[in-house]
């Protein structure tokens, strides 16, 4: 009996990809995740409004001919399924095998220049996604792959912003990948770019900015204005707590107090309150304490704790309002002009393998207060000056767990 192979209509394969990457913002995030997976330290997203071209560049490890042919060109297949830790020890975060569909979601046409082997091996990959709509089977659709002498700077010929070129020259030395997307499917107006920039700002925790930087360039941006920062970098807060849960289920904590301004009477006030020995803690010195996990979260089984594993986080508490009476009575710092970052930074965010898990902490969604702080506050509404447990509200907290 003859064996006959299955085949798939090219358009059907394209629809499968579109179901995985249906929104533009999600497509951009997926591609940026792939740059992190490639061990990049720099990632650039640049929309050139004069030419209506979108560039995505990373200075990661690049792709060899074998990876392109046997993984990149096989829908649903990815080396990340077997090798889920990169050479630099990063857990692979991109969705396995659907990155190419993110490109399809963004534009009709795509060129990719990728370099490996110290910059000596350069490959140019070109695809027209509309060819998936002409009634052919997937095995009849092809992309062009050629060895080339083109370098990154030549590939960016026609790029309007010279600051992008300068950054590429400075940081793209021996390897990396640049995508050039044309015939874009969306209107890349200022509102869309602002939304994407906000998404990128919350994509990775601030603590990773030392090893991985994202830039979102427009035509007028410099390297300084294009760098995407987490709003937490310059966030004005009253209290900050960092914690880390170890394998032994011990919780190491550091607490910073930033609420008070005692002025010239600081020593007399602290003496009166019996806090003179703790003076340093009111001047950016953290209070260090270690707790047993069961002290903080009782009634958790050993099996549940082991499933949680090691994790850490950082929380910020910030008042949203202040009366003149409270300011004077409690020696509070003046919070006039304090920026509300909830709409951009969100609430308490979850990260897995250093990338956001949505929708937890997303502003203006039901998952913003996934810890149900508001409900706890309603059940115990005592104020600071009242007896009993005082609980914070959801709109007073931002932070990350990762």
Roles of regions detected by a PLM:
Residues 1-183, 189-190:
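GHKL (Bergerat-fold) ATPase N-terminal catalytic module, capturing the glycine-rich phosphate-binding loop
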Residues 145-402:
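N-terminal assembly/transducer modules of large multi-domain enzymes
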């Amino acid at each position: 009996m003859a064996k006959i192979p299955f085949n798939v209509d090219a358009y059907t394969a394209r629809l499968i990809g579109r179901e995985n990457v249906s929104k533009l913002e999600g497509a951009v995030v997926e591609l940026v995740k792939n740059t992190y997976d490639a061990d990049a330290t720099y990632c650039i997203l640049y929309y050139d409004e004069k030419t209506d071209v979108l560039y995505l560049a990373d200075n990661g490890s690049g792709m060899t001919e074998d990876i392109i042919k046997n993984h990149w060109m096989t829908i649903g297949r990815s080396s990340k399924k077997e090798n889920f830790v990169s050479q630099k020890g990063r857990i692979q975060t991109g969705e396995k095998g659907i990155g190419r569909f993110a490109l399809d979601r963004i534009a009709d046409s795509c060129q990719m220049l990728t370099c490996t082997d110290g910059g000596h091996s350069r490959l140019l990959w070109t695809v027209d996604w509309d060819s998936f709509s002409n009634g052919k089977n997937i095995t009849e659709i092809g992309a062009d792959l050629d060895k080339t002498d083109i370098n990154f700077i030549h590939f960016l010929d026609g790029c309007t912003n010279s600051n992008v070129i300068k950054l590429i020259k400075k940081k793209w030395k021996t390897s990396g990948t640049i995508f050039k997307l044309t015939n874009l499917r969306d209107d890349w107006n200022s509102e869309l770019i602002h939304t994407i920039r906000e998404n990128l700002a919350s994509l990775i925790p601030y603590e990773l900015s030392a090893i991985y930087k994202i830039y979102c360039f427009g035509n007028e941006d410099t390297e300084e204005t294009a760098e995407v920062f987490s709003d937490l970098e310059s966030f004005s807060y009253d209290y900050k707590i960092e914690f880390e849960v170890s394998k032994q289920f011990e919780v190491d904590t550091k607490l910073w107090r930033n609420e008070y301004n005692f002025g010239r009477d600081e020593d007399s006030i602290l003496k009166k309150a019996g806090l003179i020995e703790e003076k340093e803690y009111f001047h950016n010195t953290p209070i260090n304490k270690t707790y047993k996990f069961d002290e903080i979260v009782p009634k958790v089984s050993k099996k549940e704790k082991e499933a949680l594993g090691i994790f850490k986080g950082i929380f910020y508490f910030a008042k949203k309002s202040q009366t003149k009476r409270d300011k004077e009575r409690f020696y509070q710092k003046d919070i006039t002009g304090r920026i509300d970052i909830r709409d951009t930074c969100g609430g308490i965010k979850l990260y897995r393998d250093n990338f956001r898990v949505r929708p937890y902490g997303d502003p203006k969604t039901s998952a913003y207060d996934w810890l149900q702080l508001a409900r706890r506050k309603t059940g115990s509404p005592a104020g600071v000056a009242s007896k009993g447990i005082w609980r914070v509200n959801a709109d007073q907290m931002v932070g990350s767990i990762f």
